Amino acid sequence: MVFTPEDRLGKQCLLLPLLLLAAWKVGSGQLHYSVPEEAKHGTFVGRIAQDLGLELAELVPRLFRMASKDREDLLEVNLQNGILFVNSRIDREELCGRSAECSIHLEVIVDRPLQVFHVDVEVRDINDNPPLFPVEEQRVLIYESRLPDSVFPLEGASDADVGSNSILTYKLSSSEYFGLDVKINSDDNKQIGLLLKKSLDREEAPAHNLFLTATDGGKPELTGTVQLLVTVLDVNDNAPNFEQSEYEVRIFENADNGTTVIKLNASDRDEGANGAISYSFNSLVAAMVIDHFSIDRNTGEIVIRGNLDFEQENFYKIRIDATDKGHPPMAGHCTVLVRILDKNDNVPEIALTSLSLPVREDAQFGTVIALISVNDLDSGANGQVNCSLTPHVPFKLVSTFKNYYSLVLDSALDRESVSAYELVVTARDGGSPSLWATASLSVEVADVNDNAPAFAQPEYTVFVKENNPPGCHIFTVSARDADAQENALVSYSLVERRVGERALSSYISVHAESGKVYALQPLDHEELELLQFQVSARDAGVPPLGSNVTLQVFVLDENDNAPALLAPRVGGTGGAVSELVPRSVGAGQVVAKVRAVDADSGYNAWLSYELQPPASSARFPFRVGLYTGEISTTRVLDEADSPRHRLLVLVKDHGEPALTATATVLVSLVESGQAPKASSRASVGAAGPEAALVDVNVYLIIAICAVSSLLVLTLLLYTALRCSAPSTEGACTADKPTLVCSSAVGSWSYSQQRRQRVCSGEGPPKMDLMAFSPSLSPCPIMMGKAENQDLNEDHDAKPRQPNPDWRYSASLRAGMHSSVHLEEAGILRAGPGGPDQQWPTVSSATPEPEAGEVSPPVGAGVNSNSWTFKYGPGNPKQSGPGELPDKFIIPGSPAIISIRQEPANSQIDKSDFITFGKKEETKKKKKKKKGNKTQEKKEKGNSTTDNSDQ
């Protein structure tokens, strides 16, 4: 055969389309795979590269890729081995619903040259859904007149699976009256009904309980059960009948309210009331059907009554009952299927899942706070959503999967600075115009116990008057914790310690919640002047944190101790002491002395003495020293004076109110010759008690000597230091009188104690005077810090300040420096810590205004017992260094102890009270001659009488 050029060209043009068609068929070949639903990640689907005829080595160079109109994340290809595998969970019911066929369509594309392959992956159904009835209990009403073989419709079960897995078989529990009627309708669904096998008798059995079981065709089989409650009614013979048993309607979701869905028509062969039909929803109808639809009872017209939403519900199954008005009424039934058509009307939806709320303030960076998922029910660009977060917050959004985000911690938190954050998540779709939605998330910062309770100051000073009532509130401590809730719940407790031999908790208690400090018992200034303790504040965190604060409680003195008499034979206020006084005693002579002590301090312990009643006549021969208690003569005694005098001495302190004690002194006037005998008898009477206290007095003497030696050494050292120190500015001048001010208050603030310099014109300034500034407060509790206050501040209370021109007498100055005074000042007020009074130093030498009296002691707080002096007609003899005084007082002892050795025949009187001068009386005795025996008997009789008066 010969081919011309024209024939060859025509044949080539015809061959080219054939080759292209063959290449397209080869390139567009289609593969089919199958995979069961719910397959695990990595499940093998098929060797797609091998099946497509592609070499493994050319997959990457040829840009092998896969696309799908469905979810692309369900399947994935391993480019290393060319295997198609399951990438994420596949739910057939979610992917295809009840469609008989379900497959995933993939497009495989490779370049160089471009080739497109179509792959269908069939998703096989597995039996993972059991049959479900719409309700757990169905009620069926059956008239007893119904004939056997009557069928009553039942609500069947539904199975979300397909194929044989969704083929249901029903089984009814055993009953002689009922059976199960199963029919297959046009869409191959089974319509079940309750078959009446035997006539019912309501009077015999008004109700029947049955169980209907649905079993699917899967392997293994799954079942569902519903309870049937059959009520037998007594009604007529014909029920209304619809034209068809099932109706189907389609309507858009944006249909207006009032739109007619369908108009039903039912007929009843009965006449009259039994043929009058009313329409209604079946009692088993879902609540959402009633919310969205309504039916006219007379016409059977169903209309829309609520907004329809395709995304919320796209299918409604409505069971309608047509009931006649017979007695009893009968009903016919039909089903209306309403399918909703979709419209694009949805905004993005945001779902927040809080995982770690609240967030601890010590959480690490990257801690996941919440999970956020977004969804848009629309499709295409309208369903693509992007999320953003409120700026300038310590959090950020991290995308994990498609439409899934994690809210994580991006920087450190501090609850004390910011306790909560209000976050706003914004989701915006890709539509035009764009629709967006926001969601708020409140992130609270959980507290961590990182702050200990703190007090406003590390130490508090509290002033409390003694004799407070038990349970008295004296102070309130308060601590602040910057944390919150339990971490800021502060409880208070007492830091236990010993106070002497007792526990601190026996004195003080602290309320655990309020921090109020209470005194559990009355405090006694004489027993405890300062109580220092700590209160602990501890929070309720884990672990708990705490801190302590120190409280210094000063117990202020009150006038709660009456003066106590120290006379040996005075048994209290009702006792009496007798004293013999010669008529020859001169004016101003001390004939007796009343001694008293007061356990209080300050003005409460400053004692004054006065006669009761006061002397009504200027010629009354006796008087008592206002502050010394010394009874002295006011004039020379004469024969006209009564031989016996009963003196009542009232001892009164300066407290408010003042407390008193009364001493009775019986003074008998005797002739000078009788005094030695009386004194001798008194000395013999006192010998017994003195002998009993010899051992005690020896130890007291040793103690007094030791204290005196220590005092002398201290004074010498102090003098040496003062002499070596340079002079300071503001030294006192010699021409200015010393002014010592005292304040008229009833109690003294010991926290305001300060040492004052007392100056005189005769020597260097004195630094041993303790002055106390008063703290005036109407309340029994005074609180505050010890701060400097002016000692010259005026006060209106009594007693008034002393006259600055007042001076001590020469005899008083001698008595102040005597050993008797030092002994009394040290012993009468000595406590566990030693003497608690400072000795006042006053340097002035002016004539005393009145013998036997002394003005108030200088410096508040000096016990009045320190102002005890011996008086005589002149200055008493001063003891030299290392010597002891003739007599000194031992508190509580029955007599004045004599230290100096006396001759055996000495007649010195050793009575309990200091009386007049004995030396003068002794001289008079030596000058007198012995009387006759009658005179001696007379004197003896007088002496006996005097002793009886005592």
Swiss-Prot record:
The chain crosses the membrane at residues 698-718. It holds the Pfam family Cadherin_tail. PXXP repeats lie at residues 799-802, 832-835, 873-876, 891-894. Residues 30-697 are extracellular. InterPro entries: Cadherin-like_dom, Cadherin-like_sf, Cadherin_CBD, Cadherin_CS, Cadherin_N, Protocadherin/Cadherin-CA. It is found in: Cell membrane. SMART domains: CA (SM00112). Residues 34-133, 157-242, 243-350, 351-455, 456-565, 581-678 form the Cadherin domain. Residues 830-889, 901-950 are annotated as: Disordered. Residues 719-950 are cytoplasmic. Keywords: Calcium, Cell adhesion, Cell membrane, Glycoprotein, Membrane, Repeat, Signal, Transmembrane, Transmembrane helix. This is Protocadherin alpha-6.
